[in-house]
């Protein structure tokens, strides 16, 4: 059995700047029998924050074959001030335990993209979701 994860994001979108602020992530996880609930929730929380960082902040650009960002002053992963409220529900199960390593990472970006569409009608389809991308989608 694979690990199943669902995610819903609550966002605010600034229509002028295109900035997206994630207020809350809610994740529901079915990973079979959970042996250590606190550890499982911590793993899901960390993975969801990694997914959030990749969805909104992380992305490498290259100029003339060289990386544009060579240090953390210009390459901006998720910062503590951008961490939203996170709610995690672990589904009860009698199935064998399965991995929690990365599954929660993959559902965050689609949840944010759908939340942006629900909030303002802008459909974004590329990562990372930058303010310029949201502004462009709003104009479309």
Short names for language-model regions:
Residues 1-140:
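C-terminal catalytic domains of large/alpha subunits in multi-subunit enzymes
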